[in-house]
Regions:
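Surface-exposed, active-site-proximal loop segments in enzymatic domains
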Residues: 38-44, 110-122, 289-295
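Metal-dependent polysaccharide deacetylase catalytic core of the NodB/CE4 family, i.e.
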Residues: 75-157, 205, 214-216, 283-284
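Histidine/acidic-residue-rich catalytic or RNA/ligand-binding cores of hydrolases
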Residues: 109-110, 185-190, 223, 287-294
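C-terminal domain-boundary segment and adjacent tail
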Residues: 239-333
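Generic structural signal for well-ordered alpha-helices
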Residues: 55-59, 84-88, 130-137, 163, ...
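Active-site beta->alpha N-cap acidic-glycine motif
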Residues: 6-92, 279, 313-318
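Hydrophobic faces of well-ordered beta-strands that scaffold small-molecule active sites
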Residues: 26-30, 69-71, 98-102, 149-151, ...
Length: 333
């Protein structure tokens, strides 16, 4: 088994080929996690789970608009009976899937110091990353009666040993790479040069990377990676280009991205020929007061409006929802 570091840009020739007729699809991923203060230092305790009560409405909404969410579940969620009941019902009915999301600071074993660096699971010692992941993966399978096939490292925190760990655990898809983004200033990965198209992590084509979709828009979009590298040293450098509408980095998320911006990102991604557009957001945003993106009920309603508009645009472009299982099958799994 030869599996390189997922922190590195893949070598040429690793792009995944999808089966004829697959077309262009959309996958909705939900970072399904505890509520915590994003502005405060990381803590093992003191989190909440009250927003779980809002998940049934979201699931019903998804079924109405034709979305098929993948709930990427972390340790506090899988330990919560209400969350397991709500998500498990959708999984059993075939209207949702469940995957793994590792937040190491709230996931046993608790053998590391809680810090910003250690909030990226890939920065942990190899054995500790594996121990935390294995406990979580096994708990998810036991709780939902379904073997998870997809993984996202919390905070997109892959590491040099993550790829063989995922392969050994039978994970078929990773979706931790957030292309065009750089977290190295916090001690995390730099994905600014990683491709947007799905690619194989390993030459044996057992582990597929499905990057979270972002796109550069504007006259200077070809210079996007360079401009963002300069921003590391000049924090206000990029904002001027954005304000003048010369360059925008558009992530396909309702968190901090307007529907109009997202639809530009959708159009760019479709025109670029991406086989799968990967949308993402955090489950606590489904209720007010838990994330910076939904401080009020009105902002929660705006999130639903965002999904209505974006999925209508996708439908108009002929882009249908897909599942993790369909992606695995379409790439030869």
């Amino acid at each position: 088994m030869t599996t390189g570091s997922m922190l590195e840009v893949p070598p040429a020739g690793r792009s995944a080929v999808f089966a004829p007729g697959f077309g262009q699809r959309v996958l909705l991923t939900v970072d399904t996690e505890e509520e915590f203060d994003w502005r405060a230092p990381f803590r093992r305790e003191g989190y909440g789970l009250s927003h779980v009560a809002a998940i049934p409405r979201f699931q019903t909404f998804c079924e109405r608009i034709g979305a098929h969410p993948v709930y990427l579940v972390d340790w506090p969620i899988v330990q919560d009976a209400r969350a397991v009941e709500v998500i498990g019902d959708a999984v059993r009915r075939g209207t949702a899937e469940v995957g793994v999301q590792l937040h190491p600071w709230v996931n046993p074993p608790f053998d590391e110091e809680v810090s910003v660096s250690n909030s990226f699971a890939g920065n942990l010692p190899q054995g500790l990353e594996a121990a935390k992941f294995t406990l979580l993966r096994d708990a998810i399978e036991a709780a939902f009666g379904s073997e998870p096939q997809i993984y996202r490292a919390g905070r997109y925190g892959l590491g040099p040993h993550t790829a063989p760990l995922l392969r050994q655990a039978g994970i078929r898809i990773d979706t931790s790479v957030r292309s065009l983004f750089d977290y190295s200033h916090q001690g995390g990965p730099d994905y600014s040069n990683h491709p947007l198209t799905p690619y194989w992590v390993d030459p044996e084509q057992q582990l597929l990377e499905l990057p979270v979709t972002s796109a550069y828009w504007g006259p200077l979009r070809a210079l996007g990676p360079l401009i963002h590298r300069v921003q590391r040293h000049m924090p206000t450098f990029y904002s001027g280009f954005s304000r003048l509408r010369l360059l925008e980095r558009i992530a396909l998320t309702p968190e901090g991205v307007s529907a109009a911006e997202a639809m530009r990102g959708v159009d760019l991604s479709i025109d670029a020929g991406l086989p799968v557009l990967v949308l993402s957001f955090h489950s606590p945003t489904l209720a007010p007061g838990h994330t910076p993106y939904a401080a009020s009920e009105a902002q929660v309603e705006a999130l639903y409006g965002w999904f209505e508009a974006v999925y209508a645009r996708l439908a108009a472009k002929g882009v249908r929802s897909c599942t993790v299982a369909e992606i695995i099958a379409a790439t030869g799994g």
